[in-house]
Amino acid sequence: MKGLILFICGFMMIGVILAKEGYPMDHEGCKFSCFIRPSGFCERYCKTHLSASTGYCAWPACYCYGVPANQKVWDYYNNKCGK
């Protein structure tokens, strides 16, 4: 029984570790703006385009939570926006 509980907890932790968060990028590598977007846009965008669990407008850019590890999100150190 203890082994089963440990297995389930370990399996749940894998999901937490493999999920990440961050800003989605547009085609130029810039943060995806939500400045003039309707309410709920970022959540829909994150879920449909990045398979994220949720998202919101962290004015002025969308921010996504629960992004799968294989999806790219904006990174300060590898920023290619406007270059």
UniProtKB/Swiss-Prot annotation:
MF terms in GO: sodium channel inhibitor activity; toxin activity
Cell compartments where the protein resides: Secreted
GO biological process: defense response
Tissue expression remark: Expressed by the venom gland.
Keyword Nucleotide-binding found: no
Taxonomic superkingdom: Eukaryota
Alphabetical keyword list: Amidation, Disulfide bond, Ion channel impairing toxin, Neurotoxin, Secreted, Signal, Toxin, Voltage-gated sodium channel impairing toxin
Disulfide pattern: C30-C81, C34-C57, C42-C62, C46-C64
Limits of the LCN-type CS-alpha/beta domain: 20-82
Claim: Transmembrane helix is one of the keywords in the record: no
Domain statement: Has the structural arrangement of an alpha-helix connected to antiparallel beta-sheets by disulfide bonds (CS-alpha/beta).
Function according to Swiss-Prot or TrEMBL: Beta toxins bind voltage-independently at site-4 of sodium channels (Nav) and shift the voltage of activation toward more negative potentials thereby affecting sodium channel activation and promoting spontaneous and repetitive firing.
Family: Belongs to the long (4 C-C) scorpion toxin superfamily. Sodium channel inhibitor family. Beta subfamily.
Protein name as catalogued: Toxin To12
Organism: Tityus obscurus
The organism's taxonomic lineage, starting at the top: Eukaryota, Metazoa, Ecdysozoa, Arthropoda, Chelicerata
